[in-house]
Amino acid sequence: MLNTFKKVTASYLSAAYILIRETMRYKCNYCTYNEYIKNLALNFSRENIFFIKFFQAVCTTSHPLLTDDVSQYLNTFTDNAPYTDSEIDVESLERLMQEYSIEIKTPFVPIKSGAISLIFEGTLTSEKEKESVIIKCKRVGIDDKIQDAIFNMNHLISFTKIVPHIKNLNVHDIYNENKQSIVDQLSFHIEVRNIELFYSKWSKPGLDYIKIPKVYSEITQQIPNVIVMERIVGNTIYNIDPEDKDRYANLLAKFNFKSVFYDSVYHGDIHPGNVFFIKELKTKSHASIDDDDDSNDDSNDDSSDNNDSNNSNDTNPDMNNNNNNDFKKYRYKLGIIDFGIVGKFSREMQNTIFHLFKGLYEKNHDVVAHCIIDNLVEPKDALTNEKKNELIGIISKYSENHFGKETHRFLDAEDIIKINKILYGFGVQFSKEFCKIELSFAISDSVCKLLTNKTTYIDQLLTIFSKYS
């Protein structure tokens, strides 16, 4: 007990020291504001890797203290987390080179550094060809670091239940419901199965606008600390042409629509580093095929997945309805990577999200309120009929004030925080199942906002929704 107390106290004191030191440096003009925030992110992540996810979620909210430079830094921070040479699993990488004819540049230098893994480039040589591959390799000692991080965060998060202004943000439940997702990322066997699942959903005719990497599962079976997969080449979200954003927003909307309402799964970590934006110049043969596809009906979509659908729709979203000259010239695709966090919807949750989205689209604010109160809050028996009706009225009014304007939008991170404050005042909060989805929505929101141009991501999603709802 004494050792536990010392360990937790040491962790808190270290975090406090980092905060005080960096704040004093900023106040004494030793660094700019942007450098101050970046230094906090860097040093806190070294103290506890859960802070990486925290900073990732923070940048999904609009706040005057978050400058564009800081927001972009935090958005890309998960791909550039600090690491040391001792965390490179040299033994596994050398086995990979010796046993599977994979060339990796030495000395081993990662091209990206995530919280759990280091990413390397390589070339897989077979009898037929050479293929560029990506090697995802677990950091040495990361399992123990994750367990230590969970141990320390468990105590820190417990305090959020009693701190004013924080206790009603549902931080405790969001953390508890998502920490298992972090632990699951330690098992590359789980991630390989997730990649294969999404690959099977998107490697069918008519769905090639989404590129999922092919994974070499047999390698992970023999070397469990590595994943070898096809390399996807594309631009980052910060390097795409502004005029192309609407195209990509449309593709992302189709990806999420099909995943949620047809496949009953969702990618739990759609941050800017996990999406590649591909723009290919069409060949004559491709152009003629795609021109024909423009007039295709829904029969070209992934109808085989409809048997797994949990909603009443029986047609997948059409993927080629764009007819301007630029579309005729180029093929647009999204490359989706990193399937360490994948969630599955229950039938009830899938239907709830469908009706919630439909209520927001139709601006039926009573439906929105009933969806939230009847299906997304707990404990179920905490509300009397009188209190329930009162709360439904308040949420309906909130929906009218925030979603009743001409522009359409869905619940974002700030809405969830505000609504949860209202719920907390009535002795209820968002359900644990919804908490699993809540953080994923917040993280993906950063990508959606960055794709806003002439239209928004939500506008694109609503266009698809109106066609198939």
Give each language-model segment a name.
Residues 1-257, 264, 277-288, 325-347, ...:
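Broad phosphate/nucleotide-binding scaffolds in NTP-utilizing and phosphate-metabolizing enzymes
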Residues 265-272:
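Catalytic-loop of the protein kinase fold
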Residues 289-322:
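Long, acidic low-complexity intrinsically disordered regions
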